[in-house]
């Protein structure tokens, strides 16, 4: 599995600000979107382009445009919505597919409860966004859904990843690509990433 930890100074700076314990909901939300935007820039660096001729201000001019697979952005409810706006800054015409996953408190297994995928997802590259890759359960379940629907090109964008989640994702789906702002130390006894960001969903939605 291709794993890219984006080490750009802007990414590291913004992520550092997000780790502040008393950060406001407004600021956390803004930074989640901004880092999501920067991760998208990295994840789309290998998109193919083709030369086309358009009518410029002074006559015909040859330019490059993206060709090939179209894109669908796939936020995992609910926290993934916090990164979606930043992703769409770079791919504003992308279609949006939404997946909802919850964890069964008895079995601790991820359970899909909602999905609304674009009809031609088999023709699109999916950018799956979620702030945290902890155990990897929700992400694996989401990718299972996408593959069952015919999607074959999948990239994962997360703000912070734990080594445990990376290992689980690589075992389940070695063909996907992972882009993250940080690979953190690991999980604590409660399944939270350390040092992590805390509960990203609560911070984005102001329910902390």
Swiss-Prot record:
Binding site for 5-phospho-alpha-D-ribose 1-diphosphate: 78, 103, 130-138, 199
Key word Nucleotide-binding present: yes
Reactions accelerated catalytically: UMP + diphosphate = 5-phospho-alpha-D-ribose 1-diphosphate + uracil
InterPro entries in the cross-refs: PRibTrfase_dom, PRTase-like, Upp_B, UPRTase/APRTase, Ura_phspho_trans
CDD domains per record: PRTases_typeI
UniProt keyword Mitochondrion, yes or no: no
SUPFAM superfamilies: PRTase-like (SSF53271)
GO BP terms in the entry: UMP salvage; uracil salvage
Biological or metabolic pathway of the protein: Pyrimidine metabolism; UMP biosynthesis via salvage pathway; UMP from uracil: step 1/1
EC number in record: 2.4.2.9
Residue numbers binding uracil: 193, 198-200
Cofactor binding notes: Binds 1 Mg(2+) ion per subunit. The magnesium is bound as Mg-PRPP.
Disulfide bonds: none
Cofactor(s) recorded in Swiss-Prot or TrEMBL: Mg(2+)
Regulation of its activity: Allosterically activated by GTP.
Alphabetized GO MF terms: GTP binding; magnesium ion binding; uracil phosphoribosyltransferase activity
Alphabetical keyword list: Allosteric enzyme, Glycosyltransferase, GTP-binding, Magnesium, Nucleotide-binding, Transferase
HAMAP family noted in UniProt: Upp_B
Its job: Catalyzes the conversion of uracil and 5-phospho-alpha-D-ribose 1-diphosphate (PRPP) to UMP and diphosphate.
Family in the record: Belongs to the UPRTase family.
Name of this chain's protein: Uracil phosphoribosyltransferase
Organism: Klebsiella pneumoniae subsp. pneumoniae (strain ATCC 700721 / MGH 78578)
Gene that specifies this protein: upp
């Amino acid at each position: 599995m291709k794993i890219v930890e984006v080490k750009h100074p802007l990414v590291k700076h913004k992520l550092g600000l997000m780790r502040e314990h008393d950060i406001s909901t407004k600021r956390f939300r803004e930074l989640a979107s901004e880092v999501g935007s920067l991760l998208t820039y990295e994840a789309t660096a290998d998109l193919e382009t083709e030369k086309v001729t358009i009518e410029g201000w002074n006559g015909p001019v040859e330019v490059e445009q993206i060709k090939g697979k179209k894109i669908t952005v796939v936020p995992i409810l609910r926290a993934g919505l916090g990164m979606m706006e930043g992703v769409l800054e770079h791919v504003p015409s992308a279609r949006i597919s939404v997946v909802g996953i919850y964890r069964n408190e008895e079995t601790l297994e991820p359970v899909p409860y909602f999905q609304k995928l674009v009809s031609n997802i088999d023709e699109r590259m999916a950018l799956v966004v979620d702030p945290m890759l902890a155990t990897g359960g929700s992400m694996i379940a989401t990718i299972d859904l996408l593959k069952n629907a015919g999607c074959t090109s999948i990239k994962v964008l997360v703000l912070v990843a734990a080594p445990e989640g990376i290992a689980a994702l690589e075992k389940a789906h070695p063909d996907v690509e992972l882009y993250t702002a940080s690979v953190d130390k690991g999980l604590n006894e409660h399944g939270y990433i350390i040092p992590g960001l805390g509960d990203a969903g609560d911070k984005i939605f102001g329910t902390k």
